[in-house]
Each structure stands twice: as structure tokens, then as C-alpha cells.
Amino acid sequence: MAQPPYGQQPGYPGQQPGQPAMPADLPQHARERLTQMRQHHFFTSDLSVSEFLLVKEVGFHPLGLVMGSSIYHIGYQPIRGVSEELTTLTQALYQAREHAMVRMEEEADALGADGIVAVRLTVAIHNWGTNVIEFVAIGTAVTHEKAPGTWRAPNGKPFTSDLTGQDFWTLLHAGYRPLGFVMGNCVYYVAPQAPPGHPGYVPQNGELVGPTQALYDSRELAMERMQAEAEALNAQGIVGVTVSETNHTWGAAILEFSAVGTAVVASREDHQIPQPSLILSVNG
């Protein structure tokens, strides 16, 4: 996975012995916020009350709300009139998302986190220029209270997960652990079907083979790339997968398919799923 060229500075004001150095490319106010949280043992979180308590119940303590962003200008790629992947657009959107994720991980790393839970990846289209898109990654950095430093991903970075606090609790109780938030995408141009009067036009009911194959291929490419990221983490599977379709600003014929989920691995051999409890409402 491509990494943006980020540097590390040897220290920052208020750094305590044994604490990791604050990444040099983080904004000044972000460094100040993270430093204050570490010094005062103060945390922020976007977890709900129930999620917060469930995360605590499985031995993790929130360290702080972490985020990363990337504003990207999407380059131009000519369209040849046939259904095909637009690789320039695919790579641009993937890199923008990756930059946002890496910066969020850097903030978590600066807090000494083991991982990030409840990750949300959003996209915003601004009016600053043509084809300008911002990706924002937000989550809650956590550390294991009894064994800090032992829950990181195989690549040495904090694990990332888009699971809710409830799903995170269930996953750990069932004998699995998250490794990383994985994603794949594909931007595809879907060539229009033959218009009425064209030799290829079929007036009766029938499958539109060209568009069907184009959409099928684009989804499969996104899924395949997501799976490749999970395999690179030595994961056994991916949970919570969602596949979305977006036009962004390119028109109806150009679609981006993105697949995201949380790569997981077994943490023990027995996988006992907690039995659900029956709750009766006293409300009428």
C-alpha cells in the first residue's frame, strides 16, 4: 500500500520519556491537542455511552478522537467510448482515502494507541475548483489497559476497525481480533446502450449485457482489491463489508464502487458466541 512521504521530528514540546515522537506533518493545533490529552490523561471520543462502556468492558480505554484528511484534485482521463476502468480516477480516489487514513493512524500512534475503533470515512465535494474532493477519516484511539502494545497490527501500526462498539465487543468475546480497516475501489465508465433505431437496439424486454458486465466487473475489482489488503495483513477474513456506489461529480455514466470492511484473525481456537439476553419492554 502506497504511503505518503511523511517525516518524523525527534520530539515536541511536553514529550515525556518513552513516548513516540509527534509526526512532523501534523498541523500545529493537532499536535497541541494531542500533547494536552497525553499530559492531562484526558480523552475525547465519538463513541456513544453504551459503546464506551462495552469497549471498556473488553479491556480497552479510549485515548482520544483522532482524524485525518486529504483534499485531492482528481486528474483528467479521456473516455474512449467503451466500458472500461478509468485507472487515473481510481488511483486518485484510493490515494486520497489512504492519505486520510494514514494521518488518522499517525495521530493515534502519537497517543500511544493500540488501535482505532468506530472508524468513519467520509467524502465531501467543495466548491474550490473542478474535481476537488476531500476525504476525512475519524475514529477513537484506544489502548489495552492490561497489555498495551500487544494489540497492534502485524505491520506495527495501530489496528483500525469500522465496527461499532457493540460489534467490537462481540467480536472479541467470540475469539477474534481486528487487524485493519481494508478497502478497495474502482472507477468505471459505463458505455450507453444502443439508442432506438440503432442496429443493436432491442425494443422488447431483455438484459442489457454491456452495462451488466461493466457494473459486475467494477464491483468485482473493488472487492478483489479489498481482499488483497486483508491478505497482506495475514487476515483470515473480513467482517462488516459494505459496497457503495457513487457518481461524485462526473455524471451518470461514471461510477465509483468502493468496498470496505474490517480484516480479522482468530485470537483463540474456541469461538463461543455470547448468548443474546431476552429483554421485555415495560412501555405500553
Across the structure, where does each feature detected by a protein language model lie?
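Intrinsic disorder/low-complexity detector
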Residues: A2-L89, V132-P211, T262-G284
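Residue-level detector of functional hotspots within protein domains
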Residues: R38, E51-F52, V102, I125-N127, ...
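Short amphipathic alpha-helical surface micro-motifs
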Residues: F43-E51, H99-A100, V119-R120, T160-Q166, ...
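Short, well-ordered alpha-helical segments
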Residues: V66, I71, I79-R120, V182, ...
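Hydrophobic, ordered structural segments
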Residues: A96-T150
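Short, conserved loop-to-beta-strand elements that form functional interface hotspots
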Residues: G115-N127, G237-W250, H271-L280
